[in-house]
Swiss-Prot record:
GO terms for biological process: translation. This is Large ribosomal subunit protein uL24. NCBIfam families: rplX_bact (TIGR01079). One of its GO terms (cellular component) is ribonucleoprotein complex. Part of the 50S ribosomal subunit. It comes from the Bacteria. The gene is rplX. InterPro entries: KOW, Rib_uL2_dom2, Ribosomal_uL24, Ribosomal_uL24_CS, Ribosomal_uL24_KOW, Translation_prot_SH3-like_sf. Keywords: Ribonucleoprotein, Ribosomal protein, RNA-binding, rRNA-binding. GO terms for molecular function: rRNA binding; structural constituent of ribosome. One of two assembly initiator proteins, it binds directly to the 5'-end of the 23S rRNA, where it nucleates assembly of the 50S subunit. One of the proteins that surrounds the polypeptide exit tunnel on the outside of the subunit. Belongs to the universal ribosomal protein uL24 family. Coiled coil: none annotated.
Length: 125
């Protein structure tokens, strides 16, 4: 399996876009490129029963974040909402494309440096 570099980085604010935790957001604390997963702070917490060892004399129950597949998260990037003059056209079930909170990531070269940009707005991150 070929290891691919992710466009997401550690400490990025991300939004879960699919799966059990859809709609929740948090900060990336670790990225596992081999398994293509990310660990997001306070999301997908699991408990594990741990036996006492020579290094850890205390046994018990530990909680920690488990990985979420990298395709289920997107960079959180708030864009300005559209102002609608016509109330009949502003239906609550239909959200305009610019009102979404997440974006894809692209790259652009500025001043001989590779910079991450938000595809939705074109601004650098």
């Amino acid at each position: 399996m070929k290891l691919q570099k992710s466009k997401l980085h550690k400490n990025d604010q991300v939004l879960i876009i699919s799966g059990k935790f859809k709609g929740r957001s948090g900060q990336i604390i670790a990225i596992d490129y081999k398994n293509e997963t990310v660990k997001v702070r306070d999301i997908n917490k699991v408990t594990k029963h741990v036996k006492p060892t020579q290094q850890k004399t205390e046994g018990g129950i530990e909680t920690f974040e488990a990985g979420i597949h990298i395709s289920n998260v997107a960079l959180k990037f708030k864009t300005p909402k559209l102002k609608s003059k016509d109330k009949a056209t502003s239906d609550t079930s239909i959200t305009p494309l610019s009102a979404k909170e997440h974006t894809k990531i692209g790259y652009k070269i500025e001043n001989n440096k590779k910079v991450r940009i938000a595809k939705r707005t074109g601004k650098s991150i």
